Regions:
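Single conserved hydrophobic/aromatic residue that forms the stacking wall/gate
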Residues: 1-14, 237-247
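Extended, compositionally biased flexible segments
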Residues: 2, 8-78, 84-85
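Generic structural motif
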Residues: 48-54, 109-112, 180, 201-202, ...
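Short, well-ordered loop/turn sites that connect or cap secondary structure elements
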Residues: 49, 108, 171, 177, ...
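Cytosolic, membrane-proximal regulatory domains of ion/volume homeostasis and mechanosensation machinery
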Residues: 64-102, 106-108, 116-168
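Short, compositionally biased
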Residues: 128-133, 193-206, 236
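Acidic, glycine-rich catalytic/binding loops that coordinate metals and/or anionic ligands
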Residues: 146, 201-236
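Short hydrophobic beta/alpha edge segments that flank linear recognition/processing sites
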Residues: 178-194, 218-233
Length: 247
């Protein structure tokens, strides 16, 4: 804990000092000093929901995406072909969190979120060496909701767990949301957040797309602008449901 905070210059970023954490999980779920994460409140600014390394991809019917060493089509990721079809022509943002990152995630806009859909997978290590040694069922436990936002349309927000994640904790079920408010957190382990946007909803920032095409991730902080809304809202956001949980 001391190494993670002091060697990376994070000692003044969080609310507690390293000696105040009771366990590594306590440290892992730590909160941040609000003044250390500026949230871009411009209505057209798409913000990062978390501190992470970001890759952003265009979605078409042949697309597949590597998430924690597992390749998914959008249909496989959501386990819902009808829902996946609605997002063709849009973008998917994959936010990879490292162990020393702030492991709480936040809402990207005002709106309404649906109930969470939970999909059981088989936990597995994200270590490629272990994957070479053991035949592992490559599917992750994950949860997602549809966030009906004011400025970006219906956005799928997914949290993905791996071997060392005890739980994905979402603070509330269906509720109204405020931009920048905490949505939930990951307990101990490496974790990933995924945002999925419909066609004509956003334009990602150019540097993020250039880095992704070149095979590089872009380091982003929660609240930082990562794109711009081009969404035109034609109906008010009201009722929203999701299929029952897949177990």
């Amino acid at each position: 804990i001391r190494y993670c905070l002091l060697s990376r210059g994070l000692g003044d970023v969080y609310k507690r000092q390293y000696k105040d954490y009771l366990s590594f999980n306590d440290f892992f779920t730590r909160k941040i000093e609000p003044q250390n994460r500026r949230i871009d409140m411009n209505k057209t600014s798409l913000i990062s929901p978390c501190d992470a390394r970001l890759s952003m991809y265009f979605i078409d019917e042949k697309s597949s995406f590597l998430i924690k060493n597992t390749r998914y089509t959008l249909k496989e990721l959501l386990r819902d072909g009808e829902l996946a079809k609605k997002y063709e022509g849009g973008y998917i943002g994959i936010f990879r969190l490292c162990v020393d990152d702030y492991h709480r995630f936040h809402f990207i806009d005002d709106g309404i979120k649906s109930h969470e859909r939970h999909i059981n997978g088989v936990f597995h290590t994200v270590n490629p060496i272990a994957n070479d040694v053991y035949p592992i069922y490559k599917e992750n436990t994950r949860e997602y909701c549809v966030h009906r936002t004011e400025n970006f349309g219906d956005v799928i927000v997914m949290e993905v767990g791996a071997l060392l994640v005890g739980r994905i904790v979402n603070n509330m079920e269906k509720c109204r949301t405020k931009k920048g408010a905490e949505k939930g957190y990951f307990e101990y382990g490496g974790s990933t957040v995924v945002l999925i946007f419909k066609k004509n909803a956003i334009i990602p920032d150019e540097d993020i797309l250039v880095n992704t095409v070149a095979g590089y991730e872009t380091k982003v902080n929660m609240g930082e602008k990562i794109g711009t809304s081009v969404y035109i809202r034609s109906v008010s956001y009201t009722h929203l449901t999701l299929p029952t949980n897949s177990r």
